Structures are given as C-alpha cells and as structure tokens.
C-alpha cells in the first residue's frame, strides 16, 4: 500500500506520521501538499495534527476546503483507509467525512499528556490487532478536542459500533460519552484526538500506537 501524508500550512505532526507508517511499519508513503489536486497512485490517506491555517475560523475549517479534499473524499468513497489524528480529526468532521463537531476543551486549556484509552470496538479495520476492551496509553495534545454530537448522531454511532476509542480513567476535554475516536458507517474513515504516531517505540514512552497501523495494513491491503 502507498499512503499520502497530507501537509497543510501549520501541520506539525506530518513527519511523525510519515515516520510511523514508513519507517516503523515498512509501508510506502510520501508527503502530498494540500494544494495538489490528485491522489492517483495512492491507496490511503493520513491527515496529521497541528494547526492548519493557524486554526482560523475553527480548527480544520479552512483546510476542509483545500484543493486536495475532493480527492480524499473520492478515496474514502472507494473504501480506502483515511485516518486523521488531532487536527486531522477536526478536518474530517469539518469536511463532513465524519459526524459531529470538535470544540474548545471543557476546561478552556490546552491539554498535553499521556492519556489512558479504552478500545471500545476491536472489530473495526483500525483495531483488529487490539484485544477487546484493551486499555492503552497514547499522547494527547489539543485545545479544541471536545467531541460533541446530537442525540440522533450519538444513537447512530452506538448502534453501528462507530465509537472506536473512549477516554479511560478521566475525560480530559469534556467529550460527550468520553469519545476519543470514531469511524464512519462504512468503517474506512477514522478520526481521533490522541496521537498513535507518537507511541510507536518504547523508547519514546510507549508503543500502543503500533497495533492501529498494523490493523490498517492487515485489513486494507488489496482493497
């Protein structure tokens, strides 16, 4: 598989994602600038964290209109894996690829730390390498990570098993139902606030992110 790591003005986790999928996991990947209009030859998309366009208007709002977005939506419609972490998650909800919205943290402060998570659904294409109900630790670093959805959206997320990760032990940002990561109905688009790409080696504090990327490579190869 060949992955496109999308770069926006203000992205700052792009090299982390490239390193995780290419250098640690051994997949083919390269950077693609946000102004490109084609993703021909790519089999998946990774959207990094950071502060795209300086977070003006809303986090991810301007990036959702970038020239590359129609191609990302095309790949998503074709069933290819699309993964967004932190600002990437914000871009996915702003572009309509995932339901709900992300707003300022409940405490109105930027939160940066290692956070315990629960794997709510280990049958998704992004989590089959995790044990059911596994507790994992991943870094978080965001100021606008409070996930909000209306009652109808929440009911649908629960009914379809779209809630993939929840915050365990404590809720760092006030997200409804402790939601940390969700997928679309089709199961090929994942957005999450935590950073699995920063948890790829024990030397860096933990390697609980490896199984997410391993799941992607196992479940999407050949699709």
From Swiss-Prot:
Keyword Iron-sulfur: no
EC number: 6.3.5.3, 3.5.1.2
Localization terms from the record: Cytoplasm
A Gene Ontology cellular-component term: cytoplasm
UniProt KW Cytoplasm keyword: yes
Residues annotated as signal peptide: none
Pfam families membership: GATase_5 (PF13507)
Keywords from the UniProt entry: ATP-binding, Cytoplasm, Glutamine amidotransferase, Hydrolase, Ligase, Nucleotide-binding, Purine biosynthesis
SUPFAM superfamilies in alphabetical order: Class I glutamine amidotransferase-like
Domain Glutamine amidotransferase type-1 residue range list: 2-223
GO biological process per UniProt: 'de novo' IMP biosynthetic process
Catalytic activities: N(2)-formyl-N(1)-(5-phospho-beta-D-ribosyl)glycinamide + L-glutamine + ATP + H2O = 2-formamido-N(1)-(5-O-phospho-beta-D-ribosyl)acetamidine + L-glutamate + ADP + phosphate + H(+); L-glutamine + H2O = L-glutamate + NH4(+)
Gene3D superfamilies, per database record: 3.40.50.880
GO MF terms held by the record: ATP binding; glutaminase activity; phosphoribosylformylglycinamidine synthase activity
Binding partners and assembly: Part of the FGAM synthase complex composed of 1 PurL, 1 PurQ and 2 PurS subunits.
Function of the protein: Part of the phosphoribosylformylglycinamidine synthase complex involved in the purines biosynthetic pathway. Catalyzes the ATP-dependent conversion of formylglycinamide ribonucleotide (FGAR) and glutamine to yield formylglycinamidine ribonucleotide (FGAM) and glutamate. The FGAM synthase complex is composed of three subunits. PurQ produces an ammonia molecule by converting glutamine to glutamate. PurL transfers the ammonia molecule to FGAR to form FGAM in an ATP-dependent manner.
Name assigned to this protein: Phosphoribosylformylglycinamidine synthase subunit PurQ
Source organism: Lactococcus lactis subsp. lactis (strain IL1403) (Streptococcus lactis)
Gene this protein is translated from: purQ
């Amino acid at each position: 598989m060949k992955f496109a790591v999308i770069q926006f003005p203000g992205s700052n986790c792009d090299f982390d994602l490239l390193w995780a999928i290419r250098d640690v996991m051994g997949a083919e990947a390269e950077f693609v600038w946000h102004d490109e209009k084609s993703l021909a030859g790519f089999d998946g998309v990774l959207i990094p964290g950071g502060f795209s366009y300086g977070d003006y208007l809303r986090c991810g709002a301007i990036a959702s209109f970038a020239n590359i977005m129609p191609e990302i939506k095309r790949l998503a419609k074709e069933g290819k894996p699309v993964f967004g972490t932190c600002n990437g998650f914000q871009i996915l909800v702003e572009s309509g690829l995932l339901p709900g919205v992300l707003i300022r943290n409940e405490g109105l402060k930027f939160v940066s730390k290692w956070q315990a998570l629960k794997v709510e659904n280990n049958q998704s294409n992004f989590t089959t390498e995790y044990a059911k109900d596994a507790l994992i630790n991943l870094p978080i670093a965001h100021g606008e990570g409070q996930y909000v959805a209306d009652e109808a959206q929440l009911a649908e997320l629960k009914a379809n098993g779209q809630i993939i990760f929840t915050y365990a032990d404590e809720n760092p940002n006030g997200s409804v139902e402790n939601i940390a990561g969700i997928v679309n109905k089709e199961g090929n688009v994942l957005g999450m606030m935590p950073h699995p790409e920063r948890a790829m080696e024990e030397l860096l504090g933990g390697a609980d992110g490896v199984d997410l990327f391993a799941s992607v490579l196992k479940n999407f190869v050949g699709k």
